[in-house]
Design a protein with these regions (language model features):
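Exposed, low-structure sequence patches enriched in small/polar residues
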Residues: 1-234
């Protein structure tokens, strides 16, 4: 059974209306836009009364030969409870992204720039620059390297970006503060039955001397993750 889309993860305590447009501008350009209004008659998480939200999105894409150029902008306005839990305040977030991608026979490159601005009782800004390269020059062997620099005022202006993962998996981690993130992805298909995937990612923060808190606290400004996956087809 299909499931309707919603402002949250599922349709609950919500009604609304959405208008969307997809437009082909000639042979190479496409334009996508939507506007979504949602109303919540009852209280929900961090909102102590009935509320509403607006979500606007605009994206244009240019695709020709081996090149893809994408520009997108999203404006979202929501209501949330204030510190006294007695009233509601408006929270507005703006996100923009510009992506240039090239795909060739053996190499693929992707350059991405993100900017974000969140405004409520305070204003928070941030940006992120990401570069990735993928090589598939040998049969059954593929390698991807990705590096990012991020700088945001705080968690309110965090930036999400796609990162390749193991087979049937991917992630959209959030980055805030200031630092560098880099990752190396390797995949080897050995014959018809064996496949090995390895992923190493490292994040170095410039604005803190520890990461996380409680039992998950890391007492340094850098963290590394290593993932391995081995598959055998019987």
């Amino acid at each position: 059974m299909g499931q309707s889309f919603a402002d949250g993860g599922r349709v609950q305590n919500e009604s609304g209306v959405m208008a969307k447009m997809d437009w082909a501008l000639g042979s190479f350009w496409t334009l996508t836009a939507y506007s979504d209004f949602a109303y919540f008659p009852w209280a929900k998480y961090q909102v102590y009364a009935s509320s509403h939200s607006w979500d606007h999105f605009l994206q244009t894409t240019y695709h020709r030969d081996h090149w893809i150029l994408t520009a997108r902008y999203r404006l979202r306005s929501r209501m949330k409870g204030d510190a006294t839990k007695a009233g509601l305040i408006d929270e507005t977030s703006q996100r923009a992204r510009l992506t240039v991608a090239y795909t060739g026979a053996q190499w693929a490159f992707r350059t991405q720039a993100d900017a974000t601005r969140s405004a409520s009782q305070q204003t928070s800004n941030g940006y992120m620059l990401t570069q990735s390269a993928t090589w598939s020059g040998l049969r059954g062997l593929q390698a991807t390297v990705q590096g990012s620099y991020f700088h945001t005022d705080d968690y309110a202006s965090r930036i999400y970006t796609y990162e390749r993962g193991l087979l049937y998996a991917f992630s959209f981690p959030a980055y805030f503060g200031e630092g560098l993130h880099y990752a190396l992805f390797l995949r080897a298909d050995m014959g018809q039955r064996w496949m090995l995937i390895a992923k190493l990612s490292v994040t170095d923060y410039f604005d803190r001397d520890h990461i996380s808190s409680g039992l998950q606290q890391i007492d340094r400004s850098s963290k590394a993750d290593l993932e391995l996956q081995l598959r055998l087809k019987l």
